[in-house]
Amino acid sequence: MSTRRHFLHTALGFAALPHLARAAVPGGVSLGFSLYGMKTLSLSDALKTCAEIGYANVEFALNAGYPTEPKVFTAEARKEAAQQLSTLKLDLPCLMVNISLTADDKAHAQALKTIRDAAQMALDLSAAKPAILETVCGGKPATWEQQKAGMVERLQSWAETAEKAKTTITIKAHVGSAVNSPERLLWLLEQVKSPAIQAAYDYSHFELQGIDMEESMKLLLPRTKFIHVKDSVGEPGKFQFLLPGEGRTDYVKYFTALKQHGYHGPVVVEVSGQIFNKPGYEPVAAAQKSYAALASALAKVG
């Protein structure tokens, strides 16, 4: 488990990283880190870590057990976090909510409350530029045909709630969920047709299925408002997520394609629970290693 002593020790090594100036990122892409992968650090230390490494933005995780879970993230704590984000010049583009389109009625009602709570948190943290929301969709690939009509109904309810709360929800395809492909994700978006529902892009889930990077970007980037990035190895049914740079993804090609498709916005490292739940996981080292791999590739993209 990471400790404050480890945080202070590893902070001394930040200067050795290939630092990429935040103000001079090619193509309007900025690198970020999801605090989903820093559960064992205090929020203050997590933000300091990300800023010192060179990240331009962070994602807060609203999951149970995190310091930013809505029911424990007090008004005073939100005020302090907003001030620290400003001081460190870190943007907060997104809040991870992890709700499901295949939930039962009770869980669906809770999901709607989560949307409202997250929208309020976004305003509390930055009324001028509130963060949007991000989630996967739930279900299993094999149940898509049976569940898709119900998922549309749930998504319509999400959209209505998001519109009233003046927020945007980005939904993400996942290799293990009912929505596992660009086509299925786009189909859902087309059924609901709400500006409050957009796409989140994460190529690692498509790579595992042999889906071409360029094709997935061509389909999804016109509707994409947020990007997660990580590596992966294996195939559907038996896979392992990895840190960026540990897998097969060519990140020079990746960032070049993002630029060619006109994407402007955050590319945020998501450390999978497959990684951070392993004994000996160190969030600071993971953030450093991920930044080094991505910043090096991004610097090569003119």
Regions found by a protein language model. Give the residues of each.
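Active-site beta-loop-alpha junctions enriched in small/polar residues
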Residues: 34-38, 61-65, 97-100, 138-140, ...
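Residue-level preference for long, well-ordered alpha-helices that form the structural scaffold
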Residues: 70, 74-77, 107, 111, ...
